[in-house]
UniProtKB/Swiss-Prot annotation:
Listed PANTHER family: ISOLEUCINE--TRNA LIGASE, MITOCHONDRIAL, SOLEUCYL-TRNA SYNTHETASE
Localization in the cell: Cytoplasm
Protein's UniProt keywords contain Magnesium: no
Family recorded in the similarity comment: Belongs to the class-I aminoacyl-tRNA synthetase family. IleS type 1 subfamily.
Name this polypeptide is given: Isoleucine--tRNA ligase
This protein's UniProt keywords: Aminoacyl-tRNA synthetase, ATP-binding, Cytoplasm, Ligase, Metal-binding, Nucleotide-binding, Protein biosynthesis, Zinc
InterPro entries: aa-tRNA-synth_I_CS (IPR001412), aa-tRNA-synth_Ia (IPR002300), Anticodon_Ile_BEm (IPR033708), Ile-tRNA-ligase (IPR002301), Ile-tRNA-ligase_type1 (IPR023585), Ile-tRNA_ligase (IPR050081), M/V/L/I-tRNA-synth_anticd-bd (IPR013155), Rossmann-like_a/b/a_fold (IPR014729)
Gene: ileS
Keyword Aminoacyl-tRNA synthetase listed: yes
Residues given in the record as L-isoleucyl-5'-AMP binding sites: 550
Subunit comment: Monomer.
Coiled coil: none
Domain notes: IleRS has two distinct active sites: one for aminoacylation and one for editing. The misactivated valine is translocated from the active site to the editing site, which sterically excludes the correctly activated isoleucine. The single editing site contains two valyl binding pockets, one specific for each substrate (Val-AMP or Val-tRNA(Ile)).
Length: 885
């Protein structure tokens, strides 16, 4: 039945559309921000204030952005937007990492060239530069769709000559401080990349390795062991047996001679039971036992190069955790082997080429890939009655982080940064650095503690050259004048000049024509990105910068290299706080891969739902651990978004006739409770923002909105729609709505920039700015809970009453709460002072001896649709009758 009094009601006006149309709105407001230079105005507004710098760790300029990029950049953007609103001068300077193997490999693949040595270095570098720049352009375009608070006009790229020159200054400082050295020693070597790798470029994956026990025949014994006895050796790298030149034992360990089938075998006493069980030996006999030191000097026949013998030596790295207690030594294929080998003068055999193939030193195994030679080596040992046991071992094994192929330890001449001399200084520099999560700083410290050196040379073309000249004696020259000369050239012409010019053309005049040569290797890309605190200049914001925020893998990567370089150059850490996030997995917690078909792309989410939904997912993710994404998770965030949007719609629709200049009122009663709850929300969300806990921001806001909707908004409807426009209760509600809207706009602006800008442009408030992103975030130092405590008894009563009403509706006693006659057994004096009929939104309330619900036989007011004991001849309640007079 049509309400004939409808025209007399204060019907809310739908100012904010129900449908968000985010894709269209995001383009509209992006244009608005750009045309009106909102980002620049925010910087100008805060220019004289304290700076806040979140330094952008550079993503790699290769390929489209993945969901991990979105997680990272949006987290950063939320921080920057919040700090800007809080009055800080917060420029965000994005950057790109542009050198390195993936780009080089991409060019080689496009040109259909198998080996980088089959193309001129200059041509490869030219193509790589062009490709990197095209990728920056592509990624920049994709980043901009995420509604980031930066114009992306001021950005850095590690291939810029000025940046490269700053990088060389860091190298120069290290060199002159005595931290740079060249040495032959085993390093991580990637056959798939044909280059050395630093620890930060190695990832550990499950790997299937050969596991063999082999016998080395003794040819020169002593009083403890005899000629033709056998040493038992365990290895998971049969291919390194070609380079065997020693066996190590632990001085104080006990070793036993075991007789089995008329042969004697030597291995650690503590491992006798374990090893014999592996071999399946039943009837063996322990003949004698002795210490490791008693075996030193014994010689054995090498397992592959059987024409040669090798000695037993002492080794600090021998353990009883696995194997046999005797360790096969190949000095160029293990760091401990190398160190001991140098002391004991063991032969150093390099039988592996750069690409992993076996060279002429491998005898009959030459020209085979090292891994492919394993079965043949095992067969050779078997034919020579030296293979005691063969199986496969599944274990965590180092892989090249770019190619995902296994790496090996391989001796080669490389350039290193010595970490040991500066380790104490590095550790001291992070004593006062904070981290979120809190374990971050201890993880970084542990990684620094475990480093002795940093391999910085790479045998590739696309990168910053190591600026070293060799004199006529082939000795590296470390002279400041030479470094400064090259730095000056690079700042003007870029690093291509190192490859374009001959050695004499590069040298200052007094060094020419002396038969000098130049280094061919380039620097590790982690050295590039680790130089950003020197290469990136932000006016008025010196190092250390406030926050570095990256994935948790960067504790061994960018956090690590940045810290080392900064301590060398600035004598301090480059950051005050470290924030790290996990990886993005699919909805079931699985790693994403194209083969599984579970890859979620940020551009797909943005084009379907809008960037604000993607940003809400980021803010609503517990990012300190791995996070998940998928259709269900996105839909959950869509529902939260709708709740926020619909709340704004309701609030603003009921503020159309509200004038903040004259209608703001002092609050009483239930309205004072809502004000107190709003102040609590402000206090807690500010703490959450300060602590990078964005999930708490969403959780707190969502809970506030939910509680608001479940009571106060419903309670307010009758007063808003049916009371006089100037009614005091109505103005109190609108005062709350006004303040709630203002607060929610600020809380959600860093997370939902488009939606909040849309609402802000509609909303009329005091001291309104051109954009919500030029507003000032609220400050609040304390909260009160006086009203919360006071009103607790009411909400306890409300819950009891509505539980009874639910039963009454189910039993068809009443159709709605509006028809409920509520009997309340209550002695609380505060409750007796309240207008419980209106607060509970029921037909009538009577205090009695028991709690119960009956059907209220009242009269329905045709205007407000509420039941009363009495209505007038026009079917109006007292209130409505007065309003329409």
């Amino acid at each position: 039945m049509k309400n004939k009094y409808k025209e007399t009601l204060n019907i809310p006006q739908d100012v904010l559309p129900m449908r968000a149309n985010l894709i269209e709105k995001e383009l509209k407001f992006k244009t608005f921000w750009d045309q009106n230079k909102i980002y620049q105005k925010a910087l100008e507004k805060n220019k004289t204030n304290k700076p806040f710098i979140l330094h952008d760790g550079p993503p790699y300029a290769n390929g489209d952005l993945h969901i991990g990029h979105a997680l990272n950049k949006i987290l950063k953007d939320i921080v920057v937007r919040y700090k800007s609103l809080s009055g800080f001068y917060a420029p965000f300077v994005p950057g790109w990492d542009t050198h390195g193997l993936p780009i080089e490999n991409k060019i080689l693949k496009e040109l259909k060239i198998d080996d980088h040595k089959n193309i001129s270095t200059l041509e490869l570098r030219k193509q790589a530069r062009e490709y990197a720049l095209s990728q920056i352009k592509n990624q920049k375009k994709q980043f901009l769709t995420m509604q980031l608070f930066s114009d992306f006009k001021d950005y850095y790229q590690t291939l810029d000559p000025k940046f490269e020159a700053e990088q060389l200054k860091v190298f120069k400082k290290m060199a002159l401080d005595g931290l740079i050295y060249k040495s032959l020693q085993p390093v991580f070597w990637s056959p798939s990349s044909q280059s050395a790798l630093a620890e930060a470029e190695v990832e550990y994956h499950e790997h299937k390795s050969h596991s063999i026990y082999t016998a080395f025949k003794i040819v020169k014994g002593n009083k403890f062991v005899e000629k033709n006895d056998f040493l038992v050796i365990w290895t998971t790298t049969p291919w390194t047996l070609i380079a065997n030149s020693g066996v190590s034992v632990k001085e104080e360990f006990s070793y036993s001679k075991i007789n089995y089938e008329n042969k004697n075998y030597i291995f650690a006493t503590d491992l006798v039971q374990k090893v014999t069980e592996i071999f399946g030996w039943k009837n063996f006999k322990i003949i004698s036992s002795f210490q490791g030191k008693d075996l030193v000097g014994i010689e054995y026949q090498r397992p592959i190069k059987q024409e040669k013998t090798a000695p037993i030596v002492l080794g600090h790295h021998v353990t009883l955790e696995s194997g046999s207690g005797l360790v096969h030594m190949a000095p160029l294929f293990g760091l401990d082997d190398f160190i001991i080998g140098r002391v004991e003068k063991l032969e150093e055999i390099m039988h592996i080429n750069d690409d992993g193939s076996i060279n002429e030193f491998g005898n009959q195994f030459a020209n085979k890939f090292y891994w492919d030679a394993n079965p043949e080596i095992n067969e050779f040992l078997k034919q020579n009655n030296l293979l005691l046991h063969h199986s496969f071992l599944y274990h965590s094994y180092p892989h090249d982080w770019r190619t995902n192929k296994p790496v090996i330890y391989r001796g080669s001449n490389q350039w290193f940064v010595s970490i040991d001399p500066i380790k104490e200084k590095i550790t001291k520099s992070i004593e006062h650095v904070e981290s979120y999560p809190t374990w971050g700083i201890s993880r970084l410290k542990t990684m620094i503690d475990n480093r002795t050196s940093w391999t910085i040379s790479r045998q590739r073309a696309w990168g910053v050259p190591i600026p070293i000249f060799y004199n006529e004696k082939n000795e590296p020259v470390f002279e400041e004048e030479l470094f400064d000369h090259i730095i000056d050239l690079v700042s003007k012409y870029g690093t291509d000049i190192w490859f374009e010019k001959s050695t004499d053309e590069l040298l200052p005049e007094k060094y020419k024509n002396k038969n000098w040569t130049k280094e061919k290797d380039i620097m590790d890309v982690w050295f590039d990105s680790g130089t950003t605190s020197m290469g990136v200049k932000i006016e008025g914001a010196p190092v250390p910068w406030d926050v570095y925020l990256e994935g948790s893998d960067q504790y061994r990567g960018w956090f690590n290299s940045s810290l080392i370089n900064s301590v060398v150059y600035y004598n301090q850490a480059p950051f005050k706080k470290l924030v790290s996030h996990g990886f993005v997995l699919d909805e079931k917690g699985n790693k994403m891969s194209k083969s599984k078909g579970n890859v979620v792309l940020p551009q797909e989410i943005i084009s379907k739902f809008g960037a604000d939904i993607l940003r809400l997912w980021v803010a609503n993710s517990e990012y300190t651990s791995d996070v998940t994404i998928g259709e269900n998770i996105i839909n959950q965030n869509v529902e939260i978004y709708r709740k926020f949007r619909n709340t704004f719609r309701f609030l603003i629709a009921n503020l159309v006739d509200f004038d903040y200049k004259k209608d703001l009122k002092e609050l009483t009663g239930i309205h004072l409770l809502i004000k107190e709850q709003l102040e609590t929300l402000k206090f807690n969300t500010k703490i959450a923002y300060e602590n990078f806990q964005f999930t708490n921001v969403i959780k707190l806001t969502n809970n506030f909105v939910y509680n608001l909707s479940s009571f106060y908004l419903d309670f307010s409807k009758d007063i808003l729609y049916a009371n006089k426009i100037e009614d005091l209760q109505r103005k109190m509600i609108q005062t709350n709505f006004y303040n709630i809207t203002k607060t929610l706009l600020l809380i959600l602006a860093p997370i939902l920039p488009t939606t909040i800008e849309e609402v802000y442009q509609i909303f009329d408030q005091a001291n309104k700015k051109e954009s919500v992103h030029l507003e000032n975030f609220f400050g609040i130092s304390s909260i009160e809970t006086i009203q919360e405590e006071k009103w607790n008894s009411f909400f306890e009563l409300k819950n009891k009453v509505y539980a009874l009403i639910e039963i009454a509706i189910k039993d068809k006693l009443i159709k709605s709460a509006n028809q409920a006659l509520v009997y309340i057994k209550e002695t609380d004096e505060f409750l007796k002072t309240l207008d419980l009929k209106n607060l509970l939104m029921v037909g009538k309330v009577i205090f009695s001896k028991e709690n119960k619900i009956e059907n209220y036989e009242g009269h329905l007011c045709e205007r407000c649709r509420i039941y009363f004991d009495f209505i007038d001849k026009d079917n109006l309640c007292v209130r409505c009758s007065k309003v329409i007079l």
